[in-house]
Amino acid sequence: MLQTTLLYLINPLAYIIPILLATAFLTLIERKILGYMQFRKGPNIVGPYGLLQPIADGLKLFIKEPIRPSASSRSYFLATPTVALALALLMWMPLPLPHSIINLNLGLLFILAISSLTVYTILGSGWASNSKYALMGALRAVAQTISYEVSLGLILLSMIIFAGGFTLHTFNLAQETIWLLIPGWPLAFMWYISTLAETNRAPFDLTEGESELVSGFNIEYAAGPFALFFLAEYTNILLMNTLSVILFMGTSYNPLMPQISSLSLMMKASMLTVLFLWIRASYPRFRYDQLMHLVWKNFLPLTLAIILWHMALPLATTSLPPLT
């Protein structure tokens, strides 16, 4: 009984701690890449080559006094960052890396459902802060997230038709001979751009546009609660890129050496994450109307047309006689 209880405790911790460590060092990689792209060094003082900078930042944030605005809603103000990080970590559970903690039959729908709940944490934090800048950022986030979830859901539906199942293990099996990136490259491009918008990253960072809304929905947050929001954002970035790899660049599972599958998945996800950072350094922010036009006038008709094509083609070819 004790052994089973310990196993249930250790398994999630062994899953969560590496994710949080990767998230911490992703912030360092981002600052380094942005630094080199702007012809400067980036963090290079704390530890060798600045490698201890994330630890210093974490300590600084968590030992500071959390300041709460006097007019804010205390319970909502403190609960939303915690819920944001919990939801971000919960979405990792069905991912095969190469084994998942919970093997769900509808793993993709679970991830989509949990990712849609994250918008409530942003809206709650903006409303609870009692600040017009925070509320404006939160309202932008709601409209942006709901809009891009439409395109994400339709792209996922098309990929499910491709792979033939809702489980993420099915995608690895379907891609043993060829990556789905090759026949489904228009979907892959739209998916990647939609993940940028879903994670509120540049050039779609309208929720926390520094030049417009000071800092967006988290302007009133400091110290620990701010760090939780920060961790949730970067955890979502890693999750979306890992999911992109599973959907479009699936890794074959080798039962003799499962670590090769994990290493391959990690390297591909790292490449996509670096591309996220490269895009941030290269492109200016979209205007709000351009952001909405992109999803409703471009992505939505395209994804609907591709779904119809993927559904119609197998039905049309089943009536053909055998070519013998």
UniProtKB/Swiss-Prot annotation:
A Pfam family it matches: NADHdh
Gene Ontology cellular-component terms listed: mitochondrial inner membrane
Subcellular localization(s) per the UniProt record: Mitochondrion inner membrane
MF terms in GO: NADH dehydrogenase (ubiquinone) activity
Presence of keyword Ion transport: no
InterPro entries reported for this sequence: NADH_UbQ_OxRdtase_su1/FPO (IPR001694), NADH_UbQ_OxRdtase_su1_CS (IPR018086)
UniProt entry keywords in alphabetical sequence: Electron transport, Membrane, Mitochondrion, Mitochondrion inner membrane, NAD, Respiratory chain, Translocase, Transmembrane, Transmembrane helix, Transport, Ubiquinone
Enzyme kind, highest EC tier: translocase
Chemical reaction(s) catalysed: a ubiquinone + NADH + 5 H(+)(in) = a ubiquinol + NAD(+) + 4 H(+)(out)
Predominant place of localization: mitochondrion
One GO term (biological process): aerobic respiration
Documented EC number(s): 7.1.1.2
Membrane-spanning parts: 9-29, 43-63, 77-97, 106-126, 146-166, 177-197, 228-248, 259-279, 299-319
Annotated PROSITE patterns: COMPLEX1_ND1_1, COMPLEX1_ND1_2
Membrane topology listed for this record: Multi-pass membrane protein
Keyword Plastid assigned: no
Superkingdom of this protein's organism: Eukaryota
Job description of the protein: Core subunit of the mitochondrial membrane respiratory chain NADH dehydrogenase (Complex I) that is believed to belong to the minimal assembly required for catalysis. Complex I functions in the transfer of electrons from NADH to the respiratory chain. The immediate electron acceptor for the enzyme is believed to be ubiquinone.
Family, similarity comment: Belongs to the complex I subunit 1 family.
Protein name: NADH-ubiquinone oxidoreductase chain 1
UniProt organism field: Scyliorhinus canicula (Small-spotted catshark)
